[in-house]
Swiss-Prot record:
The gene is zurA. Keywords: ATP-binding, Nucleotide-binding, Transport, Zinc. ATP binds at G37, P38, N39, G40, S41, G42, K43, S44. Pfam families: ABC_tran. CDD domains: ABC_Metallic_Cations. Involved in a zinc uptake transport system. It comes from the Bacteria. One of its GO terms (molecular function) is ATP binding. Residues 5-241 form the ABC transporter domain. This is Zinc uptake system ATP-binding protein ZurA. Belongs to the ABC transporter superfamily.
């Protein structure tokens, strides 16, 4: 099974406004994919469709080779929202309790933690270097520390796919690089498939190996190396267009009155 996500000709609209038009792409097993685009480009809508929050209106989506409508093994997918720390900054739960909540997909609600669960929590916190904060309240931590805890919550069930929606929102600049290094290590050492929604082109150029750019439709889909060439070509096109406009203006100025 090499294709973790398959999106084929998916369209979605809100009332009469098209949010997505004929979107098609694949996320391969073991890839670190960046999904990018300007505000209002449909990135969040695409994530909601993949995660089943919204129902597609046209096209098909498959997860791990299964039609999304038939997919039941959601424990394979971890999700980190951009608003995790905003929702929990004043919440009195401990780090252990927050991470343990990531086991509900596997165990159900209000289940007592067994030794295997405790080992899973320990594993997840070690991966994000937060074991010393086990009994600290989540509200006491910085934005970067909180987001590491929420990655641990996503990792505790050992997902094969980790989806992150603008995960560095609210993270101080000093911790952003360390955060992306952590994601790259998970991709490299755990062979975990990552789908990262971001505006951070530095992160895209530095860490991901597959880029999908959308603006209500597919703009680019290829390797990170190909994307750098694409950007360079686009910059040359923009400069050429500016030169044509400048030349046209000069011609207008030179015309006799």
């Amino acid at each position: 099974m090499n294709k973790i996500i398959e999106v084929n000709n998916v369209s979605y609209h809100y009332d009469k406004e098209h949010a997505l038009e004929n979107i098609h792409f694949q996320v391969e097993k073991g890839s670190f994919t960046g999904l990018i685009g300007p505000n209002g480009s449909g990135k969040s809508t695409m994530l909601k469709l993949i995660l089943g929050v919204l129902k597609k209106q046209q096209g098909s989506i498959a997860l791990f080779g299964e039609k999304q409508a038939d997919f039941k093994d959601w424990v394979k997918i971890g999700f980190v929202s951009q608003k995790s720390n905003a929702f929990n900054s004043a919440f009195p739960a401990t780090v252990k309790e927050v991470v343990a909540s990531g086991l509900t997909k596997k165990k159900g609600l209000f289940k007592t933690l067994n030794n295997q669960d405790k080992e899973a929590i320990d594993y997840a916190l070690k991966r994000v270097e937060m074991t010393d904060y086990l009994h600290r309240n989540i509200g006491e931590l910085s934005g970067g520390q909180q987001q590491r805890v929420f990655i641990a919550r996503a990792l505790v069930s050992r997902p094969e796919l980790l989806i992150l929606d603008e995960p560095t929102v609210g993270v101080d600049v000093e911790n952003v690089k360390a955060f992306y290094e952590l994601l790259a290590e998970l991709n490299r050492t755990e062979e975990m498939t990552l789908l990262l929604v971001t505006h951070d082109l530095v992160a895209v150029n530095t860490y991901v190996n597959h880029v999908i750019s959308i603006n209500k439709r597919i703009i680019f889909d290829g390797s990170a190396h190909e994307y750098q060439h694409y950007l360079a070509d686009r910059e040359l096109e923009i400069l050429a267009e500016q030169r044509r406009r400048e030349d046209a203006c000069l011609d207008c100025d030179a015309s006799p009155v």
